[in-house]
């Protein structure tokens, strides 16, 4: 293992030297090839600067069973990057006078009359300030609910009685249910399916011929399969029925089609300037979420940042990141069909190349300790983690990837290994509620209820509106 880590380190150091001897396109390609070589990226990437595509390339396999490679026109599921498209579509209907931003949910969907969310406005749903919870309010949502097929009405019934997390308009809380609701409103006011309206108003006018709404019964030519990667192996991703992701995560597309979408937003092709500006106006802190986009400065070095509109997306076996830099009409999009991946780190380095900055190609600690876990166990892996963490000249630590590592072990029911990694994560990243929640769930799986209660309480200290932590505590206290 030490030999492989050394090889990785030497390779990355050499790449860092070579980047500046090449032109920009070659630098971008060298960068992405290094990520792919060490199992950190499979998918497609596109970079545009001043309205022109300067680099696009694909890596890895679209289908591992048949050894079919990804290409730049491979279709990927984009998860929550569907939300910017939904927001744009809804604003097109606002522009046409079919929807009003300050109208209430009950005005469009009678099923919500006399329900907690009845008075929530369209504006609040768009900006995640409605107080409508996310699906983690339901225990074991993914194994119990996400794999089922629903009609629109049936899925609305799953959450329409949910208590709001706060008074609408007073706070920010991300809610995929909120965007499913917006998709349903689009269907109600047009009398057409969300898929059809999206095609008529956005995909067809922009020539986004490789984009659409996915359902598992469809045959979609050139659509990538989704995989999970961890501990040195690829796994076929879990199934999710996309009937419960309409408006929030059911879109498939390509990097080239998303470039067309970016240009249309830049040129006000779809929306007038007033609505476009409103969409990209920063919302409530901390997320600064406008309508379908996080609108805030994106920090790509310790001292440099750029004004950006961005969104990330994650769905079974896929992870994606779409970032616009409006001041220079530039963009970066990465679509990956092996999750997880360091989408923030990749994007930061792509922007570094765009701005002629030094590329920080360091060895990722989480990748190195994966091999230690496989070969020598989690305790040894944590010992090596502590050594590599100190070597900041050659290694970097990504809290999110360390969190994903504990979650992968948990999903494989390797609870003791998961506990060791998650306990280290809790010490290293004490302010991350996801990290505390991960450890609490692992303790619960190990029947260490007192420890689980302690960390569910910590989750609520960090994030008072965590519905999953609230629900778990209620169950544990009752028991």
Regions found by a protein language model. Name each.
Residues 136-220, 243-259:
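Catalytic-site signature segments of enzymes, centered on catalytic residues
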